Amino acid sequence: MLGSGILHGTTFQKKLVAGALICCLTTHVDAGVVLLYHHVDEGTPAITSITPDQFNRHMDIIVAEGFTVLPLDELVKRSMDASSGPEKSDEKIVAITFDDAYRSIYTTAFPNLQARGWPFTIFVATRLIEEKNPYYLTWAQLTEMSTHGATIANHTDSHTHMIRRLDAEMADHWKGRMRRELLTAKGLLVDHGLDSNLFAYPYGEYDEETLNLVGDLGMIGFGQQSGAIGPHSNPLLLPRYPLAGVYVGEAAFREKLRSLPLPVLHPQIEPMVSDNFKPPLELSFITNTLNLSRLTCYGPGGLMALSETSSTNVLATPAEEVSVGRTRYNCTLPKGNRFYWFSQLWIRKQSDGSWYHEP
């Protein structure tokens, strides 16, 4: 793949993939889809919110589409199983996740999910809980939900931008600081009986060093890039569909539920861009049986230019430069009434080299 660098798999990543293949040989499914919510509220910022009515409608659609809601760790194991043959299952599976532990998860989402008997995962930045911030959950609420199907997982201690270095910060100091972020959060979760090896990158940001750190600590990592999980997914950078603001429409939600992992080879591309602000994306497919003429990719400026460099390789080039902040390319390929789906993150600093501000 092309880009400013390639993210190489860690030893942990390879062991995790092997373990997933061994443990679940009788439960292979086509894909596992993970949903990502933040606020379930009408009075919070639209960019991270879904209304209670919209959330309930999403849950009803899950039922109507015949999906089984699984705990997140089980969904990962089953969807990354590469077995085939008579044991293969056609079961459609989905997992529900929330980032940041906002209070509306307890007051609005939890009663809905509890009534349905569905498991879910909350990724918690523990310092916000420790500080008793009124906008966030309490340890008592997290513990209560954990007894009713919730997995409480790691989202760092302070919800920091993991890829950002302090002024004049050396690599070893940065690594130590990030280890403390992860281990402090883990320690607090363990102290409350809420241990998990699941981790979500704050803001969905990552680079090679953060992925390696998460792998070295034996965690499974989740981003905020779209797509479904399959046998070739990177267990340190699993996709989730962010659902908020303008991205909660019912038709689009059904398409995301039905989506399949685009069968391309990993590793992922290093997302940070520093000189070429129109970074190309090379997709290397694991098979030459797909009709790649139906592949569509969107990026800055809309539809991306595609060129087949071989029977299994496609190069996608954006019409415009990626903007300052976080940008994603999204590629889809139809399969019947479903879509293969792949998303790639890009990160660009401001022109003076400083970091962008969050909205």
Give names to the regions the model predicted.
Residues 32-46, 65, 90-94, 102-104, ...:
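Metal-dependent polysaccharide deacetylase catalytic core of the NodB/CE4 family, i.e.
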